[in-house]
Amino acid sequence: MNTIVTSREEILKASRILIQQNGWAAVNIRSVAAACGVSVGSIYNYFDSKTALVSAAVESVWNDIFHHPENGDAFQDTLSCIRWMYQQMEYGCKQYPGFFAHHSLVFIQHGMTGGKEKMHEAWQHILSSLCDVLKNDSHVREDAFNQQFTPEKFAGVLFSLMLSALVRQDFDPSAVLEVVRRTLYEGNSE
């Protein structure tokens, strides 16, 4: 047994690997401790319960999937952002099979409100980023938004389409890109 205390990030990395390999059922204090080569007590130094561990693992997976790229090109305009988001959704489904479809069900079954909160925090971060892109996109027509149709409301529509695509595991953004072009831009050009 490894006597060196592991870090929170190493614990979350081991949790992500367990999720990738065996799904949510594999994440518990004992299995993560074994994967890290540390005692169960070492995990409890960072997480006081399985719920706390799973909640942090959810946040960690969302961060891994939607971590902003270094160069920022994906956030130059709305079309680039949508393309990047759909690429990341596909990456997430490949890296973490069943994550999008099953993790909220896990929280409901086990009463894990902390995990649901982490999921909603991640969603809010995605919505905020999308809204920022909409507000700063130089290609958007001046009259595209008004009091009834705000960047925040359109970000919500785009996010709903994204969640629908996740459920269907359809990572082709072409229809959403066309909606953006027709709704926000002059003509149909990029």
Residue ranges and their predicted role:
Residues 1-6, 143-145, 190:
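N-terminal intrinsically disordered/low-complexity leader segments
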Residues 4, 10, 14, 18-52, ...:
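Helix-turn-helix
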Residues 4, 126, 147-155, 172-177:
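Short amphipathic alpha-helix in the helical subdomain of ABC transporter nucleotide-binding domains
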Residues 47, 103-112, 164:
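Short helix-capping/turn signature of helix-turn-helix
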Residues 59-66:
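Short, basic, alpha-helical segments at the C-terminal edge of helix-turn-helix-like DNA-binding modules
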Residues 79-105, 167-171, 189:
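Helical hydrophobic small-molecule/effector-binding pocket
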Residues 94-95, 111-140, 149-152, 156:
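Amphipathic alpha-helical packing segments from all-alpha helical-bundle domains
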